[in-house]
Swiss-Prot record:
InterPro entries: ApbE-like_sf, MA1715-like, UPF0280
Name of the protein in question: UPF0280 protein Mthe_1297
SUPFAM superfamilies according to UniProt: ApbE-like
Domain of life: Archaea
UniProt record similarity statement: Belongs to the UPF0280 family.
HAMAP family assigned: UPF0280 (MF_01079)
Length: 237
């Protein structure tokens, strides 16, 4: 298996595939997606700044912009809440179209997966005492998004205090926007069980929250197992 780190402006990704050809295809897809996105932001800077769903002013917006707008509208967050998952999704879709049977793009903790074999996705919750756990992902039969948000780790905007809020969806852009919304819902006094109401949609397969020494799951979450999580493999800047 080939694992390659790839950075382009704010996009910091780890790409995993069985062939270098598919790695290069993923890089090209990331470059194309970012180029389209940056050109649209230059046309309408509000798209990058708004924290609420965005109504497209034009019909010919690029596919990544339309996808981000749709995903974010489901959870009442801004479109940039879906950017990492959308970029990862387009990259894995391009790999699969080129014949890849194993394709993973981890875009800063927002992961798009297409796999014909089981794999583990580590759960990183920062300073929480809940450590060394992973989701056991079985052959996906399609692309799967496993995306996370945190109010205590990393530079992304979150209005909550979850150490990690993870959402699983068939569309990584939807998983990303959902993770942002779920993370925002986790306040110090909130019932974790009640927080899941913000992602209770048909498009969401399951979700997980860790806050301090508490963990809660909702929906059809893959098996959680003990694992020696290799924190040096976490995609970060």
């Amino acid at each position: 298996m080939i694992r390659e780190y790839f950075r382009l402006h704010q996009t910091i990704a780890t790409i995993v595939a069985r062939s270098q050809e598919h790695i290069e295809i993923a890089k090209s897809a990331i470059i194309d997606s970012r180029t389209q996105l940056e050109e649209f932001i230059a046309f309408d800077p509000l798209f990058q700044l708004t924290l609420v769903p965005y109504d497209l002013p034009v019909d010919n917006a690029p596919p990544i912009v339309k996808r981000m707008c749709h995903a974010s509208s489901l959870f009442h967050v801004g479109p940039m809440a879906a950017v990492a998952g959308a970029i990862a999704a387009f990259a894995v879709e391009a790999m699969v179209e080129a014949g890849a049977d194993y394709a993973v793009v981890d875009n800063g903790g927002d992961i798009a997966i297409f796999s014909d074999e089981p794999l583990l996705v580590g759960i990183y919750a920062g300073s929480s005492p809940i450590k060394n756990l992973a989701l056991e992902i079985h052959p996906t039969g399609g692309i799967l998004g496993v995306c996370s948000s945190s109010g205590t780790i990393g530079p992304s905007i979150s209005f909550g205090c979850a150490d990690v809020a993870t959402v699983i969806s068939r569309d990584p852009a939807i998983a990303d926007a959902g993770a942002t919304a779920l993370g925002n819902a986790v306040t110090p006094d909130a019932s974790l069980k009640e927080c899941f109401s913000v992602v209770d949609r048909d498009e969401v397969i399951g979700a997980l929250i860790i806050r301090g020494d508490e963990m809660a799951v909702w929906g059809e979450v893959p098996p959680i197992r003990r694992a020696r999580v290799k924190y040096d493999l976490i995609t970060k800047g």
